[in-house]
Amino acid sequence: MRLFGKKPKPAKARLSLPRWMLARFDAAQTTKDNARHWSAAEFLSADAEADSNVRKILRTRARYEVQNNSYARGIVKTLADDTVGTGPRLQMLLEDEAKNRLVEHDFAEWAKRIRLAAKLRTIRMARCQDGEAFAVLAQNPRLSTNVTLDIQLIEADRVTDDEMNADGRSVDGITFDSFGNPVSYNVLKAHPGGTASFGTDSVTVKAENMIHVFRQDRPEQHRGIPEITSALPLFAHLRRFTLAVVSAAEAAADFAGVLYTDAPANGEADAVEAMDTIQLERNMLLTMPGGWKMSQVDPKQPVTTYGEFKHEILNEIARCLSMPYNIAAGNSSGYN
């Protein structure tokens, strides 16, 4: 029945979205509370994020921290010692035992002459604090062994691009083919920070003669960053907190005691010159001015939480290297 003489319009179908399409990730939301935290997050490629300038800053700071922080130095050195140990040993499994012993002896002699274990430890330390290590396979005529192959270590700062030779397939000194395989390395003749620098003079080393060691954290990443990068601010906090505790304890220890009085101002207490100092000697008998008392300063340092702070921050530092706390701290007293 038409009450107003018009045909009613058909109802429009309401679009019903699946429930999963209405979901959102909380971490993808930018609010006034988290905007500052995520302000440094950028959408860059692996090589752009770790370009030559960024890696130079990270290497410089990591080296500085390792040189001046005993915990950082110990962690890096322990990592290298535990990884390499006394060096690799060759075990031959041929049927001829005499040949096995001969080859094993020659390998051990060659490894000793080129200081293989020491160089491997240096490579592991460089990978941790510099992010990467380079080693050139070259013939050393001064070796007295039957095999004259030697390993020449190259610092990461020397493998870089000459501005005149940079192209699309070169990533800061490393040239790749269309499949991403390294073809050659551009190595400066001297360290750019050395006193005998040759400027941009460089040599080209073929990929088959170069060993490049680094940890690839992202696809299409071709250069390494220090493995302790995420821990560098924590190392700084550890040193600053330690210095603050020591400074507070020293400041409190500068005062053997303080004179005070309970008498009101202009009261019956003897007049004492403000900010006056008295030298105290051991086993001395001290008399106080009338109405005055002596009290020692409560230093409140070191704080009781100092040990807990060091434990937690060292544990956090060691996580970026997958190292247990007792190894990083060099202390297993709490494990027994």
Please tell me what each predicted stretch does.
Residues I211-N336:
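Extended, charged amphipathic alpha-helical segments
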Residues R63-Q216:
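Structured, mid-chain assembly/scaffold modules that mediate subunit interfaces
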Residues M1-T31, T200-R240:
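N-terminal start-of-domain structural block
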Residues M21, A50, V54, L58, ...:
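Generic structural signal of hydrophobic/aromatic residues within well-ordered alpha-helices
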Residues M1-G87:
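N-terminal-proximal low-complexity accessory segments that begin disordered
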Residues R2-L15, E104-V147, P219-I225, S247-A269, ...:
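Short N-terminal signal/transit or membrane-insertion segments
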Residues Q29-R36, I57-Q67, G180, A196, ...:
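Short, mixed-charge, low-aromatic patches
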Residues F25, Q29, D33, H37, ...:
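Amphipathic, alpha-helical segments enriched in basic
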